Amino acid sequence: MAQQMPSPEEIAAQLQMIRDQIAELQGVLAQLELRLRSVQAAKETVEKAAGQDGETLFPGDPELNTILKARLLEPGKAIVHLGLNVYAKLDTAKATEILAKKEDALKRSLETLKQELDKLSRTHDQYLQLLQALTAGQAAQQAGQQQKQGS
């Protein structure tokens, strides 16, 4: 038994679902990239603070709209988010290690997500080509029928 070709409407619906998935994944990708930049900035700040004693300057925001002058009360220590609203005061080497692990995990997640987006984009392109071929075939078929009726 031969498989029936899906209708253009069914393919268009599938295309829209794929587009929605792509948009959703792009949103997640943007969030992960933002988190990665945040972790990288935190790691850089901890690394810079590791050798500081006394007063130092810290960025008040990522775009450097403000710079804060601060006195380190416990040089060589940093308070790091461990997850689930749990923070720990650690030496800067351990804090940097934890942040580096978070950075690596985010990079792996980003890579996996980018691969999934690539796969969805290829699927989208295949469905789009199929829809265009079906639409062109239907148009040619209708033109042929009109020509027969005109004869």
Curated annotation (Swiss-Prot):
Cited InterPro entries: PFD_alpha_archaea, Prefoldin, Prefoldin_subunit_alpha
One record GO biological process: protein folding
Gene Ontology MF term list: unfolded protein binding
Broad class of where this protein is predominantly found: cytoplasm
Keywords: Chaperone, Cytoplasm
Cellular component GO terms, alphabetical: cytoplasm; prefoldin complex
Localisation per UniProt entry: Cytoplasm
Function according to Swiss-Prot or TrEMBL: Molecular chaperone capable of stabilizing a range of proteins. Seems to fulfill an ATP-independent, HSP70-like function in archaeal de novo protein folding.
Family: Belongs to the prefoldin subunit alpha family.
SUBUNIT field: Heterohexamer of two alpha and four beta subunits.
Name of this chain's protein: Prefoldin subunit alpha
Gene symbol of the encoding locus: pfdA
